[in-house]
Regions:
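Active-site signature of cysteine proteases
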Residues: 230-303
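Active-site-adjacent structural segments surrounding the nucleophilic cysteine of cysteine proteases
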Residues: 51-178
Length: 391
């Protein structure tokens, strides 16, 4: 969708009703974002980044480690061809029995029966109206792929946080309902408040700082996923090493869109920017590069994904037209489609002209307390979420 096609909602400066907000849940045209062995056992994050940054040293030989040129700053030992999934990221529901779809059980696992089921009754669980709506929206978002889930779960297997049941992750295959549901679960954690908060905080740091934090964390045995964004699209990958080269740094990654292939994100130290030249494909089949600076690269620590999570939207819509009792309304937009346009043409404006959403191909946020999030799927349709304060 082009910027001049943006949908706009004008609301009062004090209150936005839930019924009005939910009317914005729609499908619009958007672009595709791309086409367990030894390792640390902790899933913590670095508390004092200034302290650990000083400890990062790049002295090992990258060629000897099979990591190209330069010096090794960090290497946790994860390698595509053994620790990645043998199958690529996939879109939508492909199993004949629908076993790879998003389920009520997964939502209960995230938030608990007390939040998801009517009267908190788990067996049998009758989903609340907002739970039913969430399942429908997240099921639609699966049409854009499961990059966040595959990036997270492959690393959890490697770090020993979860057990794959095989000698090496690469031995797993699909269809495999239990594996697919596990991937869906970790994919959906990107939408919970705790994970969104950690990711958003990391995006306030510049690429060089994040790279040094990553190197320190990998050296300490910590687990992270990387999120990258370009023109409103999002993709998630698994970092496993950092090397130092003349121009800056290289982050070595497993991209679940390309199993069995080690890829890299380049960090230009002087410009303080990042570039990933194999994120997607142009219509002619040639690679399409993504790039960015502060605000478009994120690190999400594994410890942010510890359930159960707080469900900030679960009591929305108790009565028709009412606003949420937890302080804000969530507007979700499933977006997917053609190549080359912003990921979502959603723009919300207050009566006094403050905006949040995509304007002119750029994400803007002029509403205090509002949060704009682009889901990471890796293949197309994604879930765009806007949280709006009601007071």
């Amino acid at each position: 969708m082009r910027p001049d096609d943006n949908h706009s909602l004008t609301a009062g400066s004090r209150r936005l009703t839930l019924a009005t907000a939910l009317a914005l849940v729609m499908v619009v045209t958007a672009a595709a974002c791309g086409g367990s062995s030894s390792g640390g056992s902790t899933d913590g994050s670095i508390d004092d980044s200034s302290e650990v940054l000083a400890e990062v040293e790049c002295t090992g030989s990258a060629p000897e480690a099979g990591l190209g040129e330069g010096q090794v700053c960090a290497d946790n030992g994860f390698r595509p061809t053994s620790d990645d999934f043998s199958f690529p990221n996939w879109a939508g529901v492909q199993d004949q029995d629908g076993g790879d779809g998003f389920t009520l059980d997964t939502l209960v696992r995230l938030y608990g029966a007390s939040e998801v089921c009517v009267d908190g009754i788990a067996d049998p669980c009758a989903p609340t109206p907002i739970a039913t709506q969430t399942i429908e929206q997240w099921s639609g978002a699966l049409a854009g792929g499961r990059c966040e889930g595959m990036a997270t779960l492959s690393l959890r297997y490697y770090l020993g946080l979860d057990q794959s049941g095989v000698a090496a992750t690469v031995e797993l295959s699909r269809p495999n309902v239990s594996l697919e549901q596990e991937i869906n679960y970790w994919w959906s954690t990107q939408f919970v408040d705790e994970v969104k908060a950690q990711a958003a905080e990391s995006r306030t740091n510049d690429p060089v700082t994040l790279t040094k934090q990553l190197a320190a964390g990998l050296t300490a045995g910590l687990g992270y996923t990387i999120g990258i964004y370009d023109e409103g699209f999002g993709h998630a990958v698994t970092p496993f090493a950092v090397t130092k080269v003349d121009s800056g740094y290289v982050i070595h990654i497993y991209d679940n869109n390309a199993p069995g292939e080690a890829r890299t994100i380049s960090i230009d130290e002087a410009a303080n920017t990042w570039t990933y030249d194999k994120t997607a494909e142009n219509p002619d089949g040639t690679p399409a590069a993504w790039s960015g600076s502060t605000g478009t690269l994120e690190l999400t620590p594994m410890n942010a994904r510890s359930a159960p999570f707080a469900c900030s939207f679960c009591d929305q819509g108790d009565s028709e037209g009412s606003a949420t009792t937890k302080g804000y309304v969530t507007v979700n937009l499933a977006a997917g489609g053609s190549t080359g346009d912003p990921a979502a043409g959603l723009l919300i404006a207050t009566a006094d002209g403050r905006r949040v959403g995509v304007a002119g191909g750029v994400v803007v946020n002029e509403i205090a307390g509002a949060v704009y999030t682009v889901g990471k799927g890796g293949l197309g349709t994604s879930l765009v979420s806007v949280e709006l304060p009601v007071n």
